Curated annotation (Swiss-Prot):
May be present in up to 3 copies per 70S ribosome. Part of the 50S ribosomal subunit, where it binds 23S rRNA at its canonical site near the L1 stalk, as well as a possible second 50S binding site near helix 25 and a possible third site on the beak of the 30S subunit. Component of box C/D small ribonucleoprotein (sRNP) particles that contain rpl7ae, FlpA and nop5, plus a guide RNA. These sRNP particles form homodimers, giving rise to an asymmetric holoenzyme. Probably part of the RNase P complex. InterPro entries: eL8/uL1-like, Ribosomal_eL30-like_sf, Ribosomal_eL8-like_CS, Ribosomal_eL8/eL30/eS12/Gad45, Ribosomal_eL8/Nhp2, Ribosomal_eL8_arc. Its main location: cytoplasm. Keywords: Cytoplasm, Ribonucleoprotein, Ribosomal protein, RNA-binding, rRNA processing, rRNA-binding, tRNA processing. Transmembrane segments: none annotated. It holds the Pfam family Ribosomal_L7Ae. Disulfide bonds: none annotated. The keyword RNA-binding applies. This is Large ribosomal subunit protein eL8. One of its GO terms (biological process) is rRNA processing.
Length: 123
């Protein structure tokens, strides 16, 4: 299946899994924002350290604005394959189209590692 138009680069499976792990750790030891509205606000306010966007969002318009907004605000973002997995990592029982890590907590090193790898992928 073709990737949605908002997916601007391919994320290796192990890096996507690290992103989900970072969400879980930040959820427990830091602060996250769940859902596209909360994520968008966190990006606009410059609070987000890392934005995680699901690749299986339908309709695409729900999250299509996030990659360009993150680029404008110079906030790293990454894709994960499943909104269901992203919701579970965020600690909610429903799917999440996107999540923003505001305070990484104990995931600080992991978030920094992901951000550096994402910069490489975006070249």
């Amino acid at each position: 299946m073709a990737k949605p138009s908002y997916v601007k680069f391919e994320v290796p499976k192990e890096l996507a899994e690290k992103a989900l792990q970072a969400v879980e750790i930040a959820r427990d030891t830091g602060k996250i924002r769940k859902g596209t509205n909360e994520t968008t606000k966190a990006v606009e306010r410059g609070q987000a350290k890392l934005v995680i966007i699901a690749e299986d969002v339908d309709p695409e318009e729900i999250v299509a604005h996030l990659p360009p907004l993150c680029e404008e605000k110079e906030i790293p973002y990454i894709y994960v394959p499943s909104k269901k997995e992203l919701g579970a990592a965020a600690g909610i029982e429903v799917a999440a189209a996107s999540v923003a890590i505001i305070e990484p907590g104990k995931a600080r090193d992991l978030v920094e590692e992901i951000a550096m790898k994402v910069k490489e992928l975006m070249k």
